[in-house]
Amino acid sequence: MPHTITTTDELAAYCARAATQPYVTVDTEFLRERTYFAQLCLVQVAMPGTDDTDAVLIDPLAEGLSLEPLYELFRNVNVVKVFHAARQDLEIFFVEGGLVPTPLFDTQVAAMVCGFGDQVGYETLVRRIAKANLDKSSRFTDWSRRPLSDAQKVYALADVTYLREIYEYLSAELARTDRTHWLEEELAQLTNADAYVVDPENAWKRLKLRSNSGRVVAIAQQLAAFRETYAQEKNVPRNRVLKDDALLELAGTKPKTVADLGKSRLLLRDARKGAIAEGLVAAVARGMSVPNSEIPKVQAGRDRSNLNPALADLLRVLLKAKAENAGVATKLIASSSDLDDIASGFTDGVWASGWRSEVFGADALRLLNGEVALAAKGQKVKIVEV
């Protein structure tokens, strides 16, 4: 049965061994349904090797256990930290330990570069690369409950044991095709610590504002900042404090008193009284007092009034053909929104530089300028010089 580490000394000994290896594979189990911050419940780590002691479970809920030895390993620049779909795991370690593990390898991103499709799942990679099938019977486990059953432990550990073979295959494939630098460009976004810092003052930018009124924007900014701060301090999901539609309603109705909140059709019961209600009214007042010159500007989307639908369709055909030829997921090269931008006459974007330009961007611009055309030959689409 998988071994579970429950003491700091044992964790330090394991991490000292792992520090001599070229890489470790890492995964986490956590809960987030009822909290703002994810509750870390289990960490799975494996190093190269077949011995039972090479892959372990770490119980962060064990009394007295410090994860500092693990964080020291995460800071070791000589050991690659391998994850699959790393973003949520990285966010947890940033919040819990104040760091982003580096150097990083994300097998989901690497698989997209290697032609396995868009956002391919771990189970698919296990089946296609490791030629194994995962037992998913423990998928919906409450990982905060103890003790964990043997079946739950086996399920959790499989998330890092097969990951070793997947990493070795994908890293070799990247080296063979000279695409390692493609992956590094993508991973730079994941390892940027700023991506995991939530600034309450910028929380309003996630809202889908339906009004262009500057005053509505100012109030929405203050309401969103209050909601984010309250949710963080109380560690509750932001939508349990104030739902987006209720926030936008208040930004429009501009309640001046707690009693005015009773007129809302959308406010949750707990938001109509007490600290939340008082905070909402105060936020509205702050929004009303923001000078016009300091009201944040809503970033307007690009004007696509000149969008040529036929050209957008041609670009989609070109993208799919070029992606298939290069063995890269289309989503990694350009999004549907990018294609609409190109078809509207915009010639800047991530697709227009670096390896994306080599694979697709340069030919997209040539198509836009009438220098090439698309033709079908049998089952293949090819580019024809005009």
Curated annotation (Swiss-Prot):
Q: Keywords for this entry? A: Cytoplasm, Exonuclease, Hydrolase, Nuclease, tRNA processing
According to the UniProt entry, what is the EC number of this protein? 3.1.13.5
Per the record, what are the reactions this protein catalyses?
Exonucleolytic cleavage that removes extra residues from the 3'-terminus of tRNA to produce 5'-mononucleotides
Task: Recall the GO molecular function terms of this protein's record.
Answer: 3'-5' exonuclease activity; nucleic acid binding; nucleotide binding; ribonuclease D activity
What is the main EC category here?
hydrolase
- Which cofactor(s) are needed, names only? a divalent metal cation
**Where in the cell is the protein located?**
Cytoplasm
Instruction: Supply the Gene3D superfamilies for this chain.
Output: HRDC domain (1.10.150.80), Ribonuclease H-like superfamily/Ribonuclease H (3.30.420.10)
Q: Which residues form the HRDC domain?
A: 213-294
Tell me the Pfam families matching this sequence: DNA_pol_A_exo1, HRDC
One GO term under biological process is: tRNA 3'-end processing
Its biological purpose is as follows:
Exonuclease involved in the 3' processing of various precursor tRNAs. Initiates hydrolysis at the 3'-terminus of an RNA molecule and releases 5'-mononucleotides.
Q: Could you tell me which NCBIfam families the record lists for this protein?
A: rnd
Family, according to the entry, reads as follows:
Belongs to the RNase D family.
Report the protein name in the record.
Ribonuclease D
Q: Which organism is it from?
A: Jannaschia sp. (strain CCS1)
